Amino acid sequence: MPIKVPNDLPAATVLENENMFVMRENRAASQDIRPLDLLILNLMPTKVETEIQIMRLLSNSPLQVNVRLLQMSSHVSKNTSQEYLDRFYDRFDDVKSRKWDGMIITGAPVENIDFEEVDYWDELCQIMEWSKKNVFSTLHICWGAQAGLNYHYGIPKYPLESKMSGVFAHKAIVRDDPLLRGCDDIFWFPHSRHTEVRAEDIIRNPHLHIIAVSDEAGVGIVVSENSGQVFVTGHMEYDAKTLSYEYYRDLGKGMNPHIPYHYFPDDDPSKDPVMNWRSTANLIFTNWLNYYVYQRVPYDINEIGKDSE
């Protein structure tokens, strides 16, 4: 089944050229089915690239998904024009009056800043609080996961001695969780961050469950007891060359970054990386949509959140 996007969204053309099933709004309007309504709160500076990466994964599901993109009113983007954002992105005031089946909160390159010092932190907290009664399940990515764990559960983040950059092996510790259905015993996905959350803090909270860990990267995936909150500490949505782009970007800034671990063949940046996390990313995004959202959400979307009132 397709993902529905605005008629003239540039990402749609890219996805169609990759043979992804994308449905334009005017075609979807003629269908009489119950699609899933999804928000993507895109905090990444590379807006278009992140749109493509996430929508590519969502479009691989057998479910029709209506996607709305969300921007922060309290932040001025340095990398994406306001004209583009105003054309394709909603603000919180535009979406808060209704219910949503799911929401994705992306990462953001602000790990080295205290949460409270991030210029849009207050607005993000408002959105996360609102989501508890108005969004059925929220998937948090990288810094978005750290932010969500901190806001909802008081879990702190800790600075790393050096950037965690590379593709790391993970293993399931809750093998029967639906989110991991179909995953290999050992599965890989990228991390790109300067801070971490620690297992000992999460284990102490009875409302949270760590379902996947990495010997090198630490906590991999955390879910809440009711599946309403999902936290992925890495970037399984990344393209094959995203870590390469970040590595050369940091080199250009004179930052002397470490070569991403387990990424370039023979640790040689002149060689093209092999993408070994594509199937994992597709499985977990599809499982989230199917098992955490579609199979559990009320058919009447207005019933979302009523059991928490």
Swiss-Prot record:
Main location: cytoplasm
Claim: Transferase is one of the keywords in the record: yes
Keyword Transferase carried by entry: yes
Keywords: Acyltransferase, Amino-acid biosynthesis, Cytoplasm, Methionine biosynthesis, Transferase
Source species, domain of life: Archaea
InterPro entries noted in UniProt: Class_I_gatase-like, HST_MetA, MetA_family
Residues annotated to bind substrate: K163, S192, R249
Residues at the site labelled Important for substrate specificity: S192
Site note Important for acyl-CoA specificity, residues: E111
Function text: Transfers an acetyl group from acetyl-CoA to L-homoserine, forming acetyl-L-homoserine.
HAMAP family tied to this protein: MetA_acyltransf (MF_00295)
Protein name as catalogued: Homoserine O-acetyltransferase
Organism in which the protein naturally occurs: Methanomethylophilus alvi (strain Mx1201)
